[in-house]
């Protein structure tokens, strides 16, 4: 499993994390409980959705 860099503390309370890949690493962008919204944002920024477990 790849580590997401600079994850905000509040994100631990959300089910989906949106991250953007930069130089081969994932960087935190935001967090949502709504999968559709997380997917929408990921598409907008060229990122990906990771389930926060």
What are these regions (language model features)?
Residues 23-25:
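Glycine-centered tight beta-turn/hairpin loop motif at sheet-sheet or coil-to-beta transitions
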Residues 27-29, 50:
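Local beta-strand/beta-hairpin segments that build beta-sheet-rich folds
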């Amino acid at each position: 499993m790849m580590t997401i860099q600079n994850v905000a503390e509040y994100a631990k309370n959300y089910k989906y994390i949106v991250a953007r890949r930069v130089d081969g690493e994932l960087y935190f962008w935001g967090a949502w409980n709504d999968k559709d919204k997380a997917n929408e944002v990921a598409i907008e920024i060229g990122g990906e959705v990771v389930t926060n477990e």
